[in-house]
Amino acid sequence: LTTSELSLSVRDLACERGGRLVFEGLSFSLGHSEALVLTGPNGAGKSSLLRQLAGLLDVTQGEIELSGGDPERTIGEQAHYVGHLDALKPSMSVVETIEFWRSFLGSIPQGAETALEALGLAHLADLPVAYLSAGQRRRLSLARLIAVPRPIWLLDEPTVALDAASVARLVALMKGHLGHGGMIVAATHLDLGLDGARQLRLGAGVAV
């Protein structure tokens, strides 16, 4: 990843959904090797903010600007957004799912083994997604982060359904990503123990 100059700037951002103001006046900046943890009650706008950053939700007001990345690609094309729901095709095997992501999203020419090993899924490679447990499905969704390297990770409750060992594995991957100059914005109710991570609490329509 060539991320040494990567910088994300959010200015006076607002979000409205279904005629309801979710948040407004939100501003922050984030640089390479930095993580921002979003907290706040349900409905405060954590998921909406992540979707705005990923380009999946319209910006009601304000600006989102990425500098230092690939000028030919949008923020969404330089980021992985992993939502709180796992969008997986039940009939595909674990390895087929990863190979699909590599083909569809583009990746360096290597096998899927690295991603499988990173998330502890190698022994399940040929198993159909339909037979996976909730925790295994979550790990498969997160394997996309490794299978197709991108500098920005946008994670919505990434630890949902994960046991303690899997959470530790994920945190190690997140620390490794930051160590290589990556950027992470994550909404979570769990203290991930990311040294130096900044906190942004959403609530009552504004960032506090």
Where are these regions (language model features)?
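Catalytic Walker B motif of ABC-type/P-loop ATPase nucleotide-binding domains
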Residues: 153-157
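Conserved ABC ATPase signature
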Residues: 128-135
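Hydrophobic anchor residue at the start of the ABC signature
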Residues: 142, 181
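Q-loop/switch helix immediately C-terminal to the Walker
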Residues: 85, 90-106
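Conserved ABC ATPase "signature" region
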Residues: 99, 110-125
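Helix-to-loop junction immediately C-terminal to a conserved catalytic motif
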Residues: 54
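Conserved ABC transporter NBD signature motif
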Residues: 59-77
